[in-house]
Amino acid sequence: MNKLLFKKNKKLLIVLTILVNIISQNLLAQSKNPSPLHFPTPKNIENMVFYIQRDPNINTAIYAINYQENGKIDKSNPIKAYWIRYAEKGEKKDFSYIQRKFAYGIESKASNNEEFELQFVSYKKLPLTLKKIDSDQKYHVFVNVNQKKIQVEKIFVRIEGGSFWLPNVKYAEVTGIDASSNKTITERMLL
């Protein structure tokens, strides 16, 4: 009788161990990306320098070089920003006035002929630099996060609750190329 009970308990213990392992792996994966959403990667976006994705939906803010008809950068407004509304069949849509002036808009100031200082209207503590790089003769955006200079490709903003005017932003992750190692990195900033 004891042997039979032991065999049943042994099988139960094995099943429980496997279940605990599976659940803990899922929790670990969720802690790396706690958002339940799957974010698409923007592709073939003309003159895009970086993009922002954030909770609570998959719509993506695109930041692209604003070229004039003559092919030169518009020095008074070097970045044009807009939505790719993936939740609405990938429709391109300009930011609303409120989004442009209080949330996702970018302010710029020329610092020299091919370089601009940028900052988000909603978070002025993160200075960005837009400059043309000699190696590819294209514009790129750079930022310093955690003592690392990063050529920005994407920013993810984790939002947990709050309101329209005051979202509860937990952190932002900047992904791009580390200027010193030339490797892809992601750095998190607590906000």
Name every feature range the model reports, one short phrase each.
Residues A29-F95, T184:
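N-terminal export/targeting and maturation segments
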Residues K89-Q137:
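Predominantly extracellular/secreted and cell-surface proteins with exposed
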Residues M1-P34:
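Bacterial Sec-dependent N-terminal signal peptides
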Residues T175-L191:
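Short, low-complexity, Pro/Ser/Thr/Gly-rich segments in the mature regions of secreted, periplasmic
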Residues P127-K170, I177-D178:
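Acidic, glycine-rich flexible loop segments
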Residues N66-Q68, L118-S122, G176:
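Short beta-strand element of the conserved SAM-dependent methyltransferase core
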Residues N47-F50, T60-E69, I106-S108, L128-I133, ...:
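Broad, structure-driven detector of short, well-ordered beta-strand segments within folded domains
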Residues N2-K11, K101, K109, K183-T186:
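Intrinsic low-complexity, intrinsically disordered segments enriched in polar/basic residues
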